[in-house]
A protein has these predicted regions:
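Hydrophobic alpha-helical
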Residues: 29, 33, 37-58, 132, ...
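Flexible loop/hinge segments that line or gate small-molecule binding clefts
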Residues: 51-87, 106-112, 210-218
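Exported/periplasmic ABC-transporter solute-binding proteins
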Residues: 187-230, 237-254
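Short, small-residue-biased leader/transition segments that mark boundaries at the very start
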Residues: 2-10
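Hinge/cleft segment of the Venus flytrap/periplasmic-binding protein
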Residues: 110-120, 124, 135-136, 228-274
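Hydrophobic alpha-helical segments within soluble ligand-binding/sensing domains
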Residues: 24, 81-110, 127, 156-158, ...
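Short beta-strand elements at the ligand-binding edges of bilobed clamshell
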Residues: 14-16, 72-98, 147, 219-230
Length: 274
């Protein structure tokens, strides 16, 4: 990018690493050699970034990590912008607490829960799992029957849900760690002759808050959707502006996120852009 007076001209050099860490590392090295002003990237996995981030630091290029975390020395990057995945997990469990209270669920009666996890070791998977478990363990009657990776895809969500339905005859709650897996789970549950959502056989908790899933919240097929806000560009722009002005920036920058049910979903569906 180049700076003209006080106006910033950002030329985006975009690289799609196709879900491969080695491609991301190669792209970052290429940006370092091009002497770009800033590098912004969303890491596919948490580990294995030390070397390339050290190279960026030595080249004096600020790195802004977005969306997912990196597990390395924080001094190797300038700032991180993204979701508080652990808080998202807690929000899901808090919603379930209230929902069970509303249904006058006997506190001694067992609540049978299955979990569709995302990609193994992804920040969203680790955080959402941890946050939900923190609150679940305070409820002795919440039993997590099974928790398996379904890789954030519809096809795998359906496959893992089919396996759960064959294995367990009594499932009360499905916690699905993203909307795509939820769509697969809905297909499997319907194929098994069961219903989900408001007044359904199975309570369905989803994450992401994409428009297509929020339509299903509106129609009562999904009970609740915990938002994962992807609109991080304005936060990143703000960080770059501050750095350009010589100001300090926070290391951790959480985006604002909400919990959507039938009660409040209409307020966002109108102008939802994702």
């Amino acid at each position: 990018s180049s700076l003209v007076g006080s106006e910033m001209c950002i030329r985006d050099r975009f690289n799609n690493a196709r879900q491969k860490q080695e491609n991301q590392i190669k792209a970052i090295r290429s940006y370092i050699s091009q002497r770009v002003d800033y590098i912004v990237f969303s890491p596919i996995v948490e580990d294995g970034w030390e070397t390339v981030l050290q190279e960026a630091k030595e080249a004096d290029i600020p790195v802004i990590v977005m969306d997912r975390n990196v597990s390395c020395d924080p001094s190797l990057y300038t700032a991180w912008v993204g979701s508080d995945f652990t808080e998202e997990g807690r929000n899901a469990a808090r919603w379930l607490e209230e929902d069970l209270k509303g249904k006058k669920f006997d506190q001694k009666e067992t609540v049978h829960i299955v979990v569709l996890r995302g990609t193994s070791n992804a920040s969203a998977t680790l955080g959402r799992t941890k946050g939900f478990a923190e609150i679940a363990k305070t409820h002795p009657n919440w039993e997590i029957l099974d928790s398996d990776d379904a890789d954030f895809t519809t096809a795998k969500g359906r496959e893992v849900m089919e396996k759960y339905l064959q294995k367990y005859k009594d499932i009360d709650v499905v916690v699905s760690q993203n909307d795509d897996m939820t769509f697969g789970a809905i297909e499997a549950i319907r194929a098994a002759g069961k219903t989900t959502g408001t007044g359904g056989d199975i309570t369905l908790i989803s994450f992401d808050g994409t428009r297509s899933a929020l339509e299903k919240v509106k129609s009562g097929v999904i009970n609740v959707d915990i938002e994962c806000n992807p609109l991080q560009g304005t936060y990143i722009q703000e960080i770059i502006n501050r750095l350009e002005d010589g100001e300090s920036v926070d290391k951790i920058n959480y985006v604002e996120e909400k919990v959507y049910t039938q009660k409040n979903v209409l307020s966002v569906l109108g102008d939802r852009v994702y």
